[in-house]
Amino acid sequence: MLYSKGKATTTYSIHVKQSEFAKQLGISRQALNVHLRKLRLNSYVRTGRGFIDVTEKGLALLGVSVNPAFVFIKVSPLRRSEAYQRLIELPIQRVFRVAGDMDAVLFVERERLDDALRKLAAIDGIQETKSYVTIETLK
């Protein structure tokens, strides 16, 4: 029931204890809690035991688009294993291996598309790429 009533959203999660995160920021856990409470009240983050999620509203505030770019990749059959390993190491949201005319699909933040394409150009075995930037999310 929860799944059928739910809505797909984009969030970024950090899995860290708040005490550890506060230490990394150089503030007390209590000070972090005050800041997080304000962010929660404005729906910018969700928090729980051991995690902080940045919501779509929070991402928009940070200037991160929730409408991604997709990069379709054709890989040389002789280089697939090493090319796939290099794709996994890229700082992108998701990598999918697919069947059909192309071999992989990357799910990339629009703001990181240029960087991703530069890094793809340096991977041996990448024969072709096609990039598509989404305009809006319809559903």
Residue ranges and their predicted role:
Residues 1-139:
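A compositional/biophysical signature of low hydrophobicity enriched in polar/charged and small residues
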